[in-house]
Structure formats: C-alpha cells, structure tokens
C-alpha cells in the first residue's frame, strides 16, 4: 500500500507536476473480509454497491495482504512503510519517538492539507498527532458517531472546505468503523440502533462459510455482520457523494 503513496509524493515534489497535484482521499473499513465485497465474489447480493461502483472505475489488487492482523499495528505499517518490529508500534500503546516520518508528515511537507476522520488514535504512533484537521467533531460542534453514515459525508465536506480555505490540495484519511463490532442493532446498554443500514439481511439468506456450521445463532450473527457491511458501504457512498458535490472529484485519487 505504501508504494502508490511514495510515487504520489514523488510526483508532488516534481516541479512540472506541482501546479496540478491531485487531492488524495484514502478510505478504510474495519474488520471486513475481502469476500464480503460484491466485486470480489460475495455470494450474498447487494452488500457493497458503492464499493463495487468505485472498484469498476479503479485499479484493483487480486492478491493483496496485510503484514499484521490487528488494528493499530496494521495502520502504522501502512502509514510508515515499515514492518511493526521496525516502526515500534507492535500493539495498542503510544510510541513517543518512533524515528520515522508518518505519511501525513510527508504529505504536509509537500504542501498538502491533511485531515483524518475516525480511528485517529490508532492511525499514528502517538497522540495527539499533528494532522491539520481532526474531523471527528462535526461543524455543528457535535461529536460524530462512528456508525452514522451521514456524518461521514459531512466530515468529508468539512475537510475539503478546510483545505480550500488553506488554499492547499487535500489529503484526507477517512476510516469507517463498520463492520467492526458492535454490529448493526447491537447497541451497548440496549436500546434501538438509530443508524439503520440501507439494507438489512435476514438470517435465512446469508451464506455459511465452510469453517462454520449451519446453526441459527451463526446465521443470526452473520446476518448482523452483513447488514453492517452494507452500512459500511453506505458510509463509502456518503463520502463519495460529498467528494462529487465538492467539485473536486476529477482532481482526486
């Protein structure tokens, strides 16, 4: 994942490219299997229409892997270009003197406005980290809920507006929390989940992977998971709609 970023940074430094540097929008989703995405062969229809549309317009990797399988170390591998045992972020703890430049540092150095929404504390070696904008607070002063698809569009619009005000191209990292638990409808402390996916799957329609047995509880859990995948896709749809509405879509990678 780091190689395209390094190529982009190299282009940004190049004088001939300096006047037409593209904006950068980096999206992640959390705890989602590749085979939950329609374009990558999901057996359940309609899980990811927005991701599928984006993929149809994009370069796709058929054989991509992460170097470490949990959250904060994985994200810091991506943003450092170093293995966990080299970047010092091997768990969920602060590394005050990592000794390497973060992706956001590199982008700021070449003139980008950097912003992040979601997973802020997991996306850098220590907190607070020097992003130009933390987009977890909405323009109305309310803290954005990590499962609210609409808020991701609002945050994206806010980040783009802040970059325009700074007269810089933007580099926004937008981290969607779904389908990480708690799944859709699993509200901590009980109550009704107000952030309803655009499609809710039934236990009777979900495919059962070969490593699980067909059991009512398994089906119910998978139905909640796939509904949360759909909500993650709703978030992606809101983000991409905000990008299009900003007029910056054609200038953004």
Regions found by a protein language model. Give the residues of each.
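Formylglycine-dependent sulfatase
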Residues: 2-3, 15-253
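Sec-dependent signal peptide hydrophobic core
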Residues: 5-10
């Amino acid at each position: 994942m780091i190689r395209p970023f390094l190529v982009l940074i190299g282009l940004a430094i190049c004088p001939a490219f300096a006047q037409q540097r593209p904006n950068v929008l980096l999206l992640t989703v959390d705890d989602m299997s590749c085979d939950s995405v329609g374009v990558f062969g999901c057996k359940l229809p309609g899980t990811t229409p927005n991701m599928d549309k984006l993929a149809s317009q994009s370069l796709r990797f058929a054989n991509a892997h992460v170097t470490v399988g949990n959250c904060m170390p994985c994200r810091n591998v991506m943003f450092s270009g170093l293995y966990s045992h080299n970047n010092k972020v091997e768990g969920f703890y602060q590394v005050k003197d990592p000794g390497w430049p973060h992706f956001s540092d590199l982008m700021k150095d070449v003139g980008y406005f950097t912003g992040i929404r979601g997973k802020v504390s997991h996306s850098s070696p220590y907190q607070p980290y020097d992003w130009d904008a933390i987009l977890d607070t909405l323009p109305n002063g309310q803290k954005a809920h990590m499962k609210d698809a609409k808020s991701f569009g609002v945050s994206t619009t806010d980040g783009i507006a802040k970059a325009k005000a700074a007269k810089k191209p933007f580099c926004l990292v937008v981290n969607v929390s779904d389908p990480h638990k708690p799944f859709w409808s699993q509200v901590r402390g009980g109550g009704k989940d107000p952030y309803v996916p655009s499609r809710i799957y039934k236990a009777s329609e979900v495919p059962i992977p070969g490593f699980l047995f067909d059991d009512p509880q398994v089906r119910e859990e998978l139905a909640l998971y796939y509904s949360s995948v759909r909500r993650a896709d709703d978030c992606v749809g809101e983000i991409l709609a905000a990008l299009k509405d900003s007029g910056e879509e054609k200038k953004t990678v």
